[in-house]
Amino acid sequence: MSMTTIAPEQVNRIVWNQHHDPFEILGSHPIEQNGKTVWVVRAYLPNASAAWVVLPEQRQEYPMQTVHDPHFFECIIETSELSNYQLKTKEGEHERVSYDPYAFRSPRLTDFDLHLFAEGNHHRIYEKLGAHFTEVGGVKGVYFAVWAPNARNVSVLGDFNLWDGRKHQMRKGATGVWELFIPEIGVGEHYKYEIKNFAGHIYEKSDPFGFQQEPRPKTASIVSNLNSYNWSDEDWLEQRRHTDPLTQPISVYEVHLGSWLHAASAEPAQLPNGETEPVVIASELNPGARFLTYRELASRLIPYVKELGYTHIELLPIAEHPFDGSWGYQVTGYYAPTSRFGTPEDFMYFVDQCHQNNIGVLVDWVPGHFPKDGHGLAFFDGTHLYEHADPRKGEHKEWGTLVFNYSRNEVRNFLVANALFWFDKYHIDGIRVDAVASMLYLDYCRKEGEWLPNQYGGRENLEAADFLRQVNHLLFSYFPGVLSIAEESTDWPMVSWPTYTGGLGFNLKWNMGWMHDMLDYFSMDPWFRQFHQNNITFSMWYNHSENFMLALSHDEVVHGKSNIIGKMPGDKWQKLANVRCLFAYMFAHPGKKTMFMSMEFGQWSEWNVWADLEWPLLQFEPHQQLKKFFTELNKLYRSEPALYTLDFAREGFDWIDCSDNRHSVVSFIRREKDTENFVVVICNFTPQPHSHYRIGVPEKGFYTELFNSDARQYGGSNMGNLGGKWTDDWSMHNRPYSLDLCLPPLGVLILKMDKEKTAKALGS
């Protein structure tokens, strides 16, 4: 037996998992012996009673001896070169032959990768960090890399090593990234990182860059290949690249995939190759029900949205989250679509099918905060790595969550790359950034003494603002034609202005003021609305300060607020008429549109994340008629350019009359870009019809009634103008001509001059 080549204290550092670079000890090393170079192979094999080095090309085996520990093995081989060796181990009654992870010494991360990551500018860091199935030296396996700069040791845990952190200890690089290639494992492996801090405490963490996770309540990451899906949306992406979305119709159906519709547990799931088991809903309200899969949703949700005529689907957060009741807004797996509904490839299929049906996909993105779950980002390497250490900057007490440290380059890089990732790998068409105000203000939901000012003594979070600018600048550079939408509830200036003008760089901002004004106005008894005309007109005073999206979202139908129809006054007929009036005005008003699921058929109850929507209501005619109303409203909106091409230009909107508060009537003109086409909109916000209501119009001719929210097919009283009206040579509202109209109760009319009919009649 030859003499050992390693000191006991070095062996102990491996045995006790205390070495920052196990490659210094384990694997193969050239040494000088008797004046010549030989090779020593060392391995720590906790479950082995005996081991051999196998040279498959030479068909030779060399027995290994134990040194300083019964499971630490060493073997000296007299050869000038050593490569592609394997280890044969005896574990109980079984023998196995495998490649040694510590034989693969070359790091996959280059110095340039690490440099870019350290300065916060590696835009595709998700292709480097995380778990990646690859091939090294002709051997297939998985490369693992994780950023944990303050950890004492990091190991990979998984089924492949019986979740034993001693077996696959990682190497730490100069920038705090730990890495290891594990041969002969592949896609589908479950894994975590075992992280030990300098106090000896051990944390088991999911992979921050993991592409897939186990269904809750389990928390392991899963090795996944995101490059295997064959996309069929090239035409969609090419058209998007050359289209300005701000001049296009955007009508968004906001949906929570986990509660739109459920399936009975006995209903077979559409799953590819049986890869994923259906996930049961954890709710007593729906015992035995399960979530629909992404593929089932593709076959049910997409045709429904297409029938209704929406241009986009907006998904409440689909990144992995442990608690169903968070609606997805407490994310632990930023790079993993939730496994509640299937695999990453299943979600790709869903997006692909949306695009093939001419429906865009928007995703809610949550870069403002993250939960404290032990397997997630919180206290990741035994220190406050992703969050601020000081709770005055690092904690949202109202939500019980932690705040990202945007001043740390690597954290900012994690988030910036994450935004780009969803567009790159999943072909989404836009993000809605949640709770932007909570990011921008250091004193958000904090009392005096509970927050720290910025370097200038102000309450603005300058690092967060810079982060948002960086995200939006890169987003539109890499993916022209996409949407970045801010849910920003304050008067922070220039949210939807380009970054080169000093703006935050979003191209749309939710108009929270309009939403509050509208819901306040429509909840009033109509006879009192005359005293609150400003609710209707005020939005046009500031409309051109931002690119606004008008949104009636999930936030307005929860927490005791009731659903939209429940907010309306009057009997059932008036409630439905008010709903039609509200949405017809919304679609005629400048700005893009978003509405939450269930509003389209008049659900009475609040949204409940644990239950289906009230689909049985569609058995009843009033709810069928309301659904028909939204179908026709979307059809009109998409077909009439005057309603969307100049949403954000002053020349796209003119009041005809906004001062008739006595009757609670407003009228205005919407104009089409680069043409002389326009539509006239008249809104009557009371149940009192007007048989002779005159408004001024700019041109003489016949005005066709394109849309009447009071039509019988929508459940209305069917008051209208028999298809249209000729103008009178009677000036009104500073216009040379006027129309004598019949205004229906709680109704909205949209008219357009028929130029062909007018020309024939007037002989021009």
Swiss-Prot record:
Pathway: Glycan biosynthesis; glycogen biosynthesis
Domain of life: Bacteria
GO molecular function, one term: hydrolase activity, hydrolyzing O-glycosyl compounds
Keywords, ordered alphabetically: Carbohydrate metabolism, Glycogen biosynthesis, Glycogen metabolism, Glycosyltransferase, Transferase
Pfam family, any one: CBM_48
Functional description taken from the UniProt entry: Catalyzes the formation of the alpha-1,6-glucosidic linkages in glycogen by scission of a 1,4-alpha-linked oligosaccharide from growing alpha-1,4-glucan chains and the subsequent attachment of the oligosaccharide to the alpha-1,6 position.
Protein name (record): 1,4-alpha-glucan branching enzyme GlgB
Species this protein is from: Nostoc sp. (strain PCC 7120 / SAG 25.82 / UTEX 2576)
